[in-house]
Structure formats: structure tokens, C-alpha cells
Amino acid sequence: MFTKKNYKRVIYNIVGYLGEILIIWFLKCKGYYIIKHRYKCILGEIDIIACKNKYLAFIEVKTSIFGSEIPITNKQQRSIIKAAKSFITYHTKFEEYNIRFDLYFFSLSKGLIHIPHAWQEF
């Protein structure tokens, strides 16, 4: 049975998933190869892992219906970095790639905002 709280969570999950699908489509149109969508490991998760021209992009997607930008916390950044390191450990063919952490923000009112190299680690 849906409670008001559960209903909101379902809506947020659907909106987030649709935002990720939109960004995947956008990346494919720009010539990126999508390696993984919703990569999860014990250390964290990454929304999208994509590559193009020896660049490996670990991408966080934030989606909002109303246009308010959703911040990414230092804790989330560290979690994504740990998951990225885990991914590369198990997929050694990407060890020589240039690593990038990108942030995509999408809302109906503001459209698409891309922040390449949103943070650094490697």
C-alpha cells in the first residue's frame, strides 16, 4: 500500500530514472559509448559510466521537475570516487584512460546543465 511518503519516493525515483535515460541518449548522440548504467558495488554507485576517445567519464545525474538545483555532497563525491576506483580495479582495460567526473543537472525549467570535471581525484 502506498503512503504519501512512499508515493513521493516512487515519483522521485521515476523522475531520476527518466533523467538518466535522457542523459544516456544525449551522450550517445555526442558519440559516447555507454559502459554501465546504474553501476553498483559495495563502495558506492555511479549513475552512468561512459567513454569516448580514451576518456572514461563517471557521471552523476541530478534531475528536478521544478528546476531547483540539487547539490552533490562531499560524501556523495567520495562514494562515487570509491566506486570508480573499484570499477577500474575490475576492468583493467580502462587503467590507461583519462578519468573524468562529470555532473549533469536536468530540469524542465532550466534544461540541461553539464559540469565537466565537476571534481577531481585520480
Swiss-Prot record:
InterPro entries membership: Restrct_endonuc-II-like, tRNA_endonuc-like_dom_sf, UPF0102_YraN-like
Protein name in the entry: UPF0102 protein ECH_0093
GO MF term set: nucleic acid binding
Species of provenance: Ehrlichia chaffeensis (strain ATCC CRL-10679 / Arkansas)
Disulfide bridge positions per record: none
PANTHER family given in the database record: UPF0102 PROTEIN YRAN
Protein family (similarity comment): Belongs to the UPF0102 family.
